[in-house]
Protein backbone atom coordinates (compact mmCIF):
# COMPACT_ATOMS: atom_id res chain seq x y z
CA UNK A 1 0.00 0.00 0.00
CA UNK A 2 1.26 3.50 -0.89
CA UNK A 3 0.35 6.66 0.97
CA UNK A 4 1.08 10.03 -0.65
CA UNK A 5 1.20 12.79 1.97
CA UNK A 6 1.66 16.42 0.96
CA UNK A 7 2.64 19.54 2.91
CA UNK A 8 2.51 23.19 1.86
CA UNK A 9 5.42 25.59 1.90
CA UNK A 10 5.16 28.64 4.18
CA UNK A 11 2.73 31.42 3.31
CA UNK A 12 1.05 34.55 4.62
CA UNK A 13 4.21 36.09 6.05
CA UNK A 14 5.20 33.03 8.07
CA UNK A 15 8.77 31.72 7.77
CA UNK A 16 7.77 28.12 8.48
CA UNK A 17 4.78 25.88 7.79
CA UNK A 18 4.25 23.25 10.49
CA UNK A 19 2.34 21.13 7.99
CA UNK A 20 5.43 20.58 5.85
CA UNK A 21 7.81 20.28 8.80
CA UNK A 22 5.63 17.61 10.41
CA UNK A 23 5.30 15.71 7.14
CA UNK A 24 9.10 15.55 6.93
CA UNK A 25 9.19 13.86 10.36
CA UNK A 26 6.73 11.05 9.61
CA UNK A 27 8.17 7.52 9.28
CA UNK A 28 8.45 6.19 5.74
CA UNK A 29 6.65 2.99 6.71
CA UNK A 30 3.51 2.92 8.86
CA UNK A 31 1.62 -0.32 9.50
CA UNK A 32 3.25 -1.80 6.41
CA UNK A 33 2.27 1.10 4.16
CA UNK A 34 4.94 2.99 2.22
CA UNK A 35 4.73 6.73 2.92
CA UNK A 36 5.79 9.07 0.09
CA UNK A 37 6.18 12.76 0.98
CA UNK A 38 5.66 15.73 -1.32
CA UNK A 39 6.14 19.46 -0.80
CA UNK A 40 3.58 21.54 -2.67
CA UNK A 41 3.42 25.31 -3.28
CA UNK A 42 0.80 27.47 -1.60
CA UNK A 43 -0.42 28.47 -5.02
CA UNK A 44 -3.84 27.96 -6.58
CA UNK A 45 -3.88 25.39 -9.40
CA UNK A 46 -0.11 24.72 -9.31
CA UNK A 47 -0.52 22.84 -6.03
CA UNK A 48 -3.07 20.53 -7.65
CA UNK A 49 -0.95 20.06 -10.75
CA UNK A 50 1.99 18.93 -8.64
CA UNK A 51 -0.17 16.42 -6.75
CA UNK A 52 -1.65 14.98 -9.93
CA UNK A 53 1.84 14.60 -11.43
CA UNK A 54 2.87 12.60 -8.37
CA UNK A 55 -0.30 10.49 -8.50
CA UNK A 56 0.50 9.60 -12.09
CA UNK A 57 4.08 8.76 -11.12
CA UNK A 58 3.51 6.54 -8.07
CA UNK A 59 -0.14 5.39 -8.28
CA UNK A 60 -0.92 5.77 -4.55
CA UNK A 61 -3.76 4.08 -2.70
CA UNK A 62 -4.22 7.00 -0.32
CA UNK A 63 -3.63 10.75 -0.72
CA UNK A 64 -3.55 12.97 2.37
CA UNK A 65 -2.84 16.69 2.17
CA UNK A 66 -1.72 18.61 5.25
CA UNK A 67 -2.16 22.34 5.84
CA UNK A 68 -1.76 24.95 8.56
CA UNK A 69 -4.84 26.39 10.28
CA UNK A 70 -3.56 28.95 12.76
CA UNK A 71 -5.90 29.34 15.71
CA UNK A 72 -6.96 25.71 15.98
CA UNK A 73 -6.26 23.83 19.19
CA UNK A 74 -5.69 20.37 17.74
CA UNK A 75 -5.12 18.25 14.67
CA UNK A 76 -8.31 18.38 12.60
CA UNK A 77 -9.20 15.97 9.79
CA UNK A 78 -11.53 17.75 7.38
CA UNK A 79 -14.97 16.37 6.55
CA UNK A 80 -15.81 18.32 3.39
CA UNK A 81 -14.42 20.66 0.72
CA UNK A 82 -16.50 23.15 -1.28
CA UNK A 83 -16.28 24.20 -4.91
CA UNK A 84 -15.24 27.77 -4.20
CA UNK A 85 -12.05 29.81 -4.14
CA UNK A 86 -12.47 32.99 -2.07
CA UNK A 87 -9.01 34.08 -0.99
CA UNK A 88 -8.70 36.49 1.94
CA UNK A 89 -5.01 36.93 1.11
CA UNK A 90 -2.84 36.37 -1.96
CA UNK A 91 -1.20 33.01 -2.54
CA UNK A 92 2.57 32.78 -2.95
CA UNK A 93 2.41 33.95 -6.57
CA UNK A 94 0.07 36.88 -5.98
CA UNK A 95 -3.15 35.17 -7.03
CA UNK A 96 -6.31 36.10 -5.11
CA UNK A 97 -9.38 34.49 -6.70
CA UNK A 98 -12.66 35.70 -5.25
CA UNK A 99 -15.90 33.72 -5.58
CA UNK A 100 -14.56 31.46 -8.34
CA UNK A 101 -15.49 27.81 -8.83
CA UNK A 102 -12.54 25.42 -8.61
CA UNK A 103 -13.99 23.18 -11.32
CA UNK A 104 -16.99 24.30 -13.36
CA UNK A 105 -18.12 20.70 -13.87
CA UNK A 106 -17.55 19.68 -10.26
CA UNK A 107 -20.09 19.03 -7.53
CA UNK A 108 -20.89 21.79 -5.03
CA UNK A 109 -18.89 19.83 -2.45
CA UNK A 110 -16.99 16.59 -2.02
CA UNK A 111 -16.67 14.67 1.22
CA UNK A 112 -13.46 13.04 2.40
CA UNK A 113 -13.56 9.27 2.00
CA UNK A 114 -11.03 8.79 4.79
CA UNK A 115 -12.14 7.39 8.18
CA UNK A 116 -11.97 10.80 9.84
CA UNK A 117 -13.61 9.77 13.11
CA UNK A 118 -11.35 6.74 13.46
CA UNK A 119 -8.42 9.09 12.86
CA UNK A 120 -9.59 11.43 15.61
CA UNK A 121 -10.12 8.54 18.03
CA UNK A 122 -6.65 7.14 17.35
CA UNK A 123 -5.10 10.51 18.07
CA UNK A 124 -7.13 11.28 21.18
CA UNK A 125 -6.55 7.79 22.58
CA UNK A 126 -2.83 8.49 22.30
CA UNK A 127 -2.90 11.92 23.92
CA UNK A 128 -2.98 14.15 20.83
CA UNK A 129 -5.73 16.83 20.84
CA UNK A 130 -7.88 16.24 17.75
CA UNK A 131 -11.38 16.77 16.41
CA UNK A 132 -13.34 16.61 13.16
CA UNK A 133 -13.47 19.90 11.27
CA UNK A 134 -16.43 20.81 9.09
CA UNK A 135 -14.77 23.59 7.12
CA UNK A 136 -11.49 23.62 5.23
CA UNK A 137 -11.80 27.35 4.52
CA UNK A 138 -11.75 28.89 1.04
CA UNK A 139 -8.00 29.33 0.50
CA UNK A 140 -5.48 26.92 -1.06
CA UNK A 141 -6.14 24.19 1.53
CA UNK A 142 -9.78 23.84 0.50
CA UNK A 143 -8.68 24.25 -3.13
CA UNK A 144 -6.37 21.24 -2.83
CA UNK A 145 -8.81 19.10 -0.85
CA UNK A 146 -11.62 19.79 -3.31
CA UNK A 147 -9.37 19.39 -6.32
CA UNK A 148 -7.97 16.03 -5.25
CA UNK A 149 -11.45 14.70 -4.43
CA UNK A 150 -12.65 15.98 -7.82
CA UNK A 151 -9.86 13.98 -9.47
CA UNK A 152 -10.80 10.94 -7.38
CA UNK A 153 -14.43 11.31 -8.45
CA UNK A 154 -13.60 11.79 -12.12
CA UNK A 155 -10.44 9.79 -12.71
CA UNK A 156 -8.80 7.97 -9.78
CA UNK A 157 -11.81 6.17 -8.37
CA UNK A 158 -9.87 3.69 -6.22
CA UNK A 159 -7.96 6.33 -4.28
CA UNK A 160 -8.96 7.33 -0.76
CA UNK A 161 -8.26 10.99 -0.12
CA UNK A 162 -8.72 13.80 2.34
CA UNK A 163 -7.16 16.69 4.21
CA UNK A 164 -5.84 17.39 7.71
CA UNK A 165 -5.31 20.83 9.22
CA UNK A 166 -2.72 21.35 11.95
CA UNK A 167 -2.18 24.20 14.46
CA UNK A 168 0.63 26.70 14.73
CA UNK A 169 3.81 25.58 16.49
CA UNK A 170 4.98 27.60 19.56
CA UNK A 171 7.58 29.63 17.62
CA UNK A 172 4.78 31.05 15.46
CA UNK A 173 2.72 32.43 18.35
CA UNK A 174 5.42 34.32 20.26
CA UNK A 175 3.85 37.59 19.06
CA UNK A 176 0.29 36.26 18.82
CA UNK A 177 -1.15 36.50 22.36
CA UNK A 178 -3.83 33.96 23.34
CA UNK A 179 -3.27 31.93 20.16
CA UNK A 180 -3.07 28.15 20.61
CA UNK A 181 -0.14 26.09 19.40
CA UNK A 182 1.14 22.51 19.43
CA UNK A 183 4.66 21.11 19.40
CA UNK A 184 5.92 19.91 16.05
CA UNK A 185 6.57 16.50 17.60
CA UNK A 186 2.93 16.17 18.66
CA UNK A 187 1.73 17.30 15.24
CA UNK A 188 3.94 14.72 13.53
CA UNK A 189 2.74 12.04 15.94
CA UNK A 190 -0.85 12.99 15.18
CA UNK A 191 -0.24 12.59 11.46
CA UNK A 192 1.45 9.24 11.99
CA UNK A 193 -1.51 8.04 14.09
CA UNK A 194 -3.91 9.32 11.42
CA UNK A 195 -2.16 7.28 8.75
CA UNK A 196 -2.27 4.24 11.02
CA UNK A 197 -6.04 4.67 11.42
CA UNK A 198 -6.51 5.05 7.66
CA UNK A 199 -4.49 1.94 6.88
CA UNK A 200 -6.33 -0.15 9.48
CA UNK A 201 -9.88 1.12 8.80
CA UNK A 202 -11.53 0.65 5.41
CA UNK A 203 -14.71 2.15 6.86
CA UNK A 204 -15.21 4.85 9.46
CA UNK A 205 -16.46 4.26 12.98
CA UNK A 206 -19.84 5.49 14.25
CA UNK A 207 -19.27 8.08 16.95
CA UNK A 208 -20.17 11.70 17.58
CA UNK A 209 -17.96 14.12 15.69
CA UNK A 210 -20.32 16.91 14.75
CA UNK A 211 -20.78 20.43 16.03
CA UNK A 212 -23.82 22.51 17.02
CA UNK A 213 -22.63 25.49 14.98
From Swiss-Prot:
One Gene Ontology term of the molecular function aspect: pyroglutamyl-peptidase activity
Gene3D superfamilies tied to this protein: Peptidase C15, pyroglutamyl peptidase I-like
Intracellular or extracellular location(s): Cytoplasm
Record GO biological process: proteolysis
Annotated protein name in UniProt: Pyrrolidone-carboxylate peptidase
Species of the source: Clostridium perfringens (strain SM101 / Type A)
Keyword Protease among record annotations: yes
Disulphides: none
UniProt family annotation: Belongs to the peptidase C15 family.
Amino acid sequence: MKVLITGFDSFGGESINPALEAVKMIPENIEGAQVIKLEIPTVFRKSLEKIEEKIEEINPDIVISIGQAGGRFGVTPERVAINMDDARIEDNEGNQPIDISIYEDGESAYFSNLPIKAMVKEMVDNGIPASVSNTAGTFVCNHVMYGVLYLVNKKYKNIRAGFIHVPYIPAQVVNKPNTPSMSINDIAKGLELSIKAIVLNDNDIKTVGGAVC
